[in-house]
């Protein structure tokens, strides 16, 4: 039991560390969560400051309750500033806040019962984020995805010899896969296998950026994926 508890604590700290690093990198680049969510005017600067504070608290493993509350508020701020759809796309950050809050709940006598809900909230909200990303950036708005694929030569199927695999087909398949993976996460079946496959595709995207020589974009992609990488490790360890 002691070893099991230690492993759980290490995994939770990994989630804090990865999320904190991702937030600090976002703040350094003057964005909120992702490159297309630019921080503008005074409110944007407040968001950046909140990102920095949350990132430092999570990395130092200090005042986690305050950090999770600030992360909740930041997610709400994103929803009001950029719209509900964008908030859904990054609902995994809300899931991380829920997970850390429930896993470190006080008083401690309630913590044992809430730990199970912490993992479920992380899994379900991450699943909703994947479904939202698949729909908004690919299936419902394929032009955006096709522009991205063409600009960064991201269609790795062509590099594998599938010459008839067009950018349009690539974007459609990527969107369908994200939606399906997200639904499976929400349902909670074959969680470990599902999250491993999603992680493999994210790893492929990072390799593709490096292979195409877009090193700065690759670095941003890695830091942006850090919260998901930690989430994947937690779901692999805990399951559904």
What are these regions (language model features)?
Residues 1-147, 162-176, 187-240:
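Extended, low-polarity transmembrane helix blocks
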Residues 153-162:
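Juxtamembrane membrane-water interface segments that cap and precede transmembrane helices
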Residues 182:
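Conformational-control "hinges and anchors"
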